[in-house]
């Protein structure tokens, strides 16, 4: 069922060449009144050896040229051909063969793209902006937060009403709340960028930022081992979303929701502390030991309470134990990671294909609940964890099962689904039962690219795309399958402008950033425009067509998981450029 994506696109490109003979020629000129930048290409650009695609709305094949911006020299020519798929009528062009560094535009007839770069460090500036984003979102007695110092008086426990110092950390989004399970992703994204890239420009800044964020998370851990839930909504929506007088133990102190945060958040806390052990054990052994003890206490509580039931939670649990093994060694963490992975694989749909069930490899929601698993923001831990276990323990007795599960999920589910839309993005998920909106069906299942909007809470797809991209890129390396790296690149392309709105949803990166969610009506000063922030992302209509909704929270609010996974994906692509070949 699965064919390598590069092979698929070579077929699409080479067949029309029998009829189309693009002339490299000189750079094209633009006709009077032509509309600029209708051709969609990643606003930031591409790695020299990476996948490179462009799109143009239409249904008739045309030739396109990649033109060096400075000289007007045509460096590549090829066809853009119509692909019948979801999300509109588009022509798709592939210029992955172009490896030359520089600044370029794409032209096709009277249409053009905006500028983009091809360079080994093409994503460095965007990553640096996202790192800096966290310092501007600092909460507590900082010198860099946009309204510093703030919330120095956080907070009063809801259960006892006693004051407990939990100041520090970061604001989670375009508000001033601090949701533990979501804001923890800042620790994941920053630590992955630091370890994957080991950037020369960092000079200790990422670890310093991590330690600031971790002030809050360590303070939110209870003696029992679990991490409390948040300073967010306690009695009604937004009741803690406000500024305070910064004087501890006064009536305007915000409240801590003291119950445990969700299981995935607990396991992300363990991952974060394990990473901090590695990043600080040489410079500050005492701090590293504090993080080690915090991780183990949380793991003990999670095991006692049998945390981890759905694919995301079990994947996060396996990843957390793998992180502990990387930091501490010890067979017990390897064995525990493998045990969580075994429970995860029990949820994978791995039966034989038939016309009514043309997909396999995806995961059920839980034991006894056959509904396909969907999650919009927590990320693809079910895929990422299996990749990390296979990479870390290639000789484990279960390694062949992990590899097979990765193959099934990527080749029998994600790859065929991404081929069903022109942009190559992964789906939000599959559905049984009635149509969730959009009338999209494959065999027995309905599917959507975007989360349903007929409910009180929904958000855009940036975290879903970027986290899947991380997993796909890891799988490309492990399976030696460049086609999966191509799909990973296309997830980032959508976020950075290859979408129907030609809009980058990373603030201060690329062009046409939509208006961000302005909360100044709620509290003042409101969250400013922050370069490096990643928005929730484009959402969908009830009929599952793209809808940007500029200025609305569902699509245009900053949110930590989106920042984490986008930064992580850019780091993976940069460090693993050979995965494309």
Each model region followed by its residue ranges:
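Bacterial N-terminal signal peptides
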Residues: 10-23
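Boundary at the C-terminal end of the N-terminal hydrophobic targeting segment
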Residues: 22, 27-31
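Glycan-recognition and catalytic cores of secretory/periplasmic carbohydrate-active enzymes
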Residues: 33-38, 65-88, 99-101, 105-114, ...
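Exposed aromatic-hydrophobic patches
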Residues: 90-96
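Interdomain boundary/hinge segments at the C-termini of tandem beta-sandwich modules
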Residues: 118-120
């Amino acid at each position: 069922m699965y064919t390598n994506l590069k092979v698929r696109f070579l077929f699409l490109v080479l067949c029309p060449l029998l009829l189309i003979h693009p002339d490299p020629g000189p750079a094209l000129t633009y006709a009077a009144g032509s509309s600029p930048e209708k051709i969609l290409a990643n606003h930031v650009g591409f790695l020299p050896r990476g996948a490179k695609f462009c799109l143009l709305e239409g249904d008739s094949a045309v030739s396109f040229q990649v033109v060096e911006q400075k000289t007007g020299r045509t460096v590549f020519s090829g066809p853009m051909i119509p692909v019948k798929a979801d999300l509109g009528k588009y022509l798709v062009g592939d210029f992955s063969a172009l490896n030359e560094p520089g600044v370029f535009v794409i032209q096709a007839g009277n249409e053009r793209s905006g500028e983009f770069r091809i360079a080994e460090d093409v994503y460095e500036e965007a990553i640096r902006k996202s790192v800096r984003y966290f310092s501007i979102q600092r909460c507590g007695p900082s010198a860099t937060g946009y309204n510093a110092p703030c919330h120095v008086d956080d907070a009063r426990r809801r259960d006892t009403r006693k004051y407990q110092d939990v100041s520090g950390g970061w604001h989670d989004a375009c508000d001033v709340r601090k949701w533990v399970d979501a804001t923890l992703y800042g620790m994941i994204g920053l630590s992955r960028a630091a370890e994957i890239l080991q950037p020369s420009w960092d000079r200790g800044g990422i670890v310093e930022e991590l330690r600031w964020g971790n002030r809050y998370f360590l303070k939110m851990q209870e003696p029992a081992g679990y991490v409390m839930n948040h300073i967010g909504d306690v009695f009604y929506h937004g009741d803690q979303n406000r500024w305070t007088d910064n004087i501890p133990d006064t009536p305007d102190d915000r409240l801590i929701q003291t119950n445990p945060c969700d299981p995935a958040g607990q396991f992300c806390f363990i991952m974060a502390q394990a990473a901090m052990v590695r990043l600080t054990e040489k410079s500050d052994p005492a701090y590293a030991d504090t993080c080690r003890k915090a991780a183990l206490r949380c793991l003990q509580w999670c095991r006692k309470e049998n945390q981890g039931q759905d694919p995301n939670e079990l994947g996060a649990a396996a990843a957390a134990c793998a992180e502990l093994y990387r930091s501490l060694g010890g067979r017990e963490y390897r064995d525990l990671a493998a045990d969580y992975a075994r429970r995860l694989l029990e949820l994978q749909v791995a039966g034989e294909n038939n016309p009514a069930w043309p997909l396999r490899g995806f995961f059920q929601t839980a034991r006894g609940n056959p509904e396909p698993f969907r999650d919009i923001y927590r990320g693809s831990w079910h895929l990422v964890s299996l990749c990390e276990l296979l990479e870390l323990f290639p000789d484990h007795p279960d390694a062949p099962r992990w590899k097979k599960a990765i193959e099934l999920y990527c080749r029998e589910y994600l790859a065929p689904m991404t081929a069903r839309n022109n942009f190559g993005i992964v789906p939000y998920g599959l559905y049984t039962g009635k149509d969730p909106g959009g009338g999209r069906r494959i065999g027995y299942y309905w599917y959507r690219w975007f989360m349903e909007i007929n409910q009180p809470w929904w958000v855009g797809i940036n975290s879903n795309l970027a986290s899947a991209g991380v997993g796909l890129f890891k799988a490309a390396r492990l399976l030696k399958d460049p086609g999966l790296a191509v799909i990973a690149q296309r997830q980032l392309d959508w976020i950075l402008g290859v979408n129907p709105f030609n809009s980058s949803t990373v603030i201060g990166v690329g062009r046409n950033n939509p208006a961000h969610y302005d909360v100044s009506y709620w509290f003042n000063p409101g969250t400013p425009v922050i370069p490096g922030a990643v928005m929730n992302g484009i959402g969908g209509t009830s009929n599952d067509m793209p809808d940007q909704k500029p200025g609305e929270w569902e699509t245009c609010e900053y949110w930590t998981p989106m920042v984490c996974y986008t930064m992580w994906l850019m780091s993976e692509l940069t460090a693993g450029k050979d995965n494309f070949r």
